[in-house]
């Protein structure tokens, strides 16, 4: 008897008919002789609706109270799924994050899983019950309700699978796997049978809507192999697992794009120790996530720093940098640029193959697309381009690496589903 963890997002449980479909799928899995644990998100639109109500009451709602409020969304959906299962004759029980033994730490609305006590879940499973667990939530050691932030239900599913030593973990969504690129941008993108943790992490940090990176990090840390697949059919999806030697045969696993980026360039920085720390420290204190960072020294001995961020953080970054720039001297100034996007090519085969950057840059040049910034890691090459050209850029690079020609040519994109 296998123990299977299945995660269903908000779209999958967005209506009562969809809840019945989820229950029917869980019943089929159980009837096949398996133990089943479902991890469920709030119904589609519920979380946003709760946030809207809170902000209508107050411009700055307490994050503690937001956690208490938002946790009710998942409690609604798990109860409804359990009821649907019971109507089908199954012995099902819903449990909250607290009852599941998910202990968290960190800030309210952005909790991190600290540890787990799966004893209650094990007891229910030993009694033959099917479990429906609330995603997105846990409890602090001192008893406060915590939500896990964006992608929290995926993280819950991975953590539950690790704690219970599940045989299978499935992330079920409304598309059928991970693709070489967003099929809405590249129509000939292909579904991948598998992808490594490291490639998935790079894709997650580069704009791919597959999963949040911390869910993949958690899976890698605890060795949880999981599958991204459709909740609408039984077709195989995409396995996410530790890399193996055959994976290096594919140079590029896939292409990701990230829109709504902005670039900040600081010029005239004294070339002295500690300058970078002061600048980036101010950005960090403002809780702004930076992406690409490029530094160089001008002939006059003054440094130049450029970095990218989400365009929504641009105003906050300018405010945070204002006092720092004033301290750097009369030559220092800040320039900003919006309307850019990031294109990334990812693949562990880069470690053992040369010429990847040349192929990518030639493809962009042939398409008449100018490159702004360039950033590389061991398994990723990323560039910025004009945001209006990002889709054309993605298609050009996708074609240049032939990602449409083999089902093993790449990784990529999947819709976020709660």
Feature annotation, model-predicted:
Residues 212, 223-229:
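Acidic/polar loop patches that form or flank catalytic/metal-binding clefts of enzymes
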Residues 1-216, 385-386, 405, 411-418:
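Nucleotide/pyrophosphate-binding catalytic subdomain
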Residues 237-418:
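A conserved regulatory-domain signal marking ACT and ACT-like small-molecule sensing domains
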Residues 219:
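Acidic-aromatic/histidine active-site loop/patch
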Residues 40-48, 179, 228-246, 301-302, ...:
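Terminal amphipathic helices with adjacent charged low-complexity linkers/tails
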Residues 168-172, 226-228, 291, 372-373:
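Short hydrophobic alpha-helical runs that function as membrane-insertion/retention elements
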Residues 34, 90, 224, 288, ...:
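Short phosphate-binding/catalytic loops that engage adenosine nucleotides
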């Amino acid at each position: 008897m296998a123990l299977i963890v299945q995660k269903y997002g908000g779209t999958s449980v967005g209506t009562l008919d969809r809840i019945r479909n989820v229950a029917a799928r869980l019943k089929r899995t159980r009837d096949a002789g398996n133990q089943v644990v479902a991890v469920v998100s709030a119904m589609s639109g519920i979380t946003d609706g709760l946030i809207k109500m809170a902000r209508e009451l107050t411009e700055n709602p307490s994050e503690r109270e937001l956690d208490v409020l938002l946790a009710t969304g998942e409690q609604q959906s798990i109860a409804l799924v359990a009821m649907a299962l019971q109507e089908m004759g199954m012995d099902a029980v819903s449990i909250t994050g607290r009852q599941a033994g998910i202990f968290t730490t960190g800030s309210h609305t952005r909790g991190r899983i600290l540890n787990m006590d799966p004893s209650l879940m094990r007891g229910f499973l030993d009694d033959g019950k099917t479990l429906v667990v609330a995603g997105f939530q846990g409890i602090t050691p001192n008893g406060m309700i915590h939500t896990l932030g964006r992608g929290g239900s995926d993280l819950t599913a991975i953590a539950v699978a690790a704690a219970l030593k599940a045989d299978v973990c499935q992330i079920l969504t409304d598309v059928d796997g991970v693709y070489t690129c967003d099929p809405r941008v590249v129509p000939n993108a292909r579904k991948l049978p598998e992808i490594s943790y490291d490639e998935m992490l790079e894709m997650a940090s580069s704009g791919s809507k597959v999963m949040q990176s911390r869910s993949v990090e958690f899976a890698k840390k605890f060795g949880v192999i999981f599958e991204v697949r459709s909740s609408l059919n039984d077709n195989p999806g995409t396995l996410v697992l530790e890399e193996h030697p055959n994976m290096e045969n594919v140079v590029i696993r896939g292409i990701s794009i990230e829109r709504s980026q902005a670039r900040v360039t600081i010029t005239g920085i004294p070339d002295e120790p500690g300058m970078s720390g002061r600048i980036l420290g101010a950005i960090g204190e403002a809780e702004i996530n930076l992406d690409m960072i490029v530094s160089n020294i001008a002939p006059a001995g003054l440094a130049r720093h450029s970095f990218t961020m989400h365009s929504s953080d641009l105003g906050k970054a300018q405010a945070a940098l204002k006092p720092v720039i004033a301290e750097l001297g009369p030559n220092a100034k800040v320039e900003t640029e919006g309307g850019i996007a990031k294109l990334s090519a990812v693949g562990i085969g880069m470690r053992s193959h040369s010429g990847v950057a040349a192929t990518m840059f030639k493809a962009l040049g042939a398409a008449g697309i100018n490159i702004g910034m360039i950033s590389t890691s061991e398994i990723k090459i990323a560039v910025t381009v004009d945001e209006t050209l990002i889709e054309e850029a993605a298609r050009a690079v996708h074609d240049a690496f032939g990602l449409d020609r083999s089902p093993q040519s790449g990784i990529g994109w999947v819709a976020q589903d709660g």
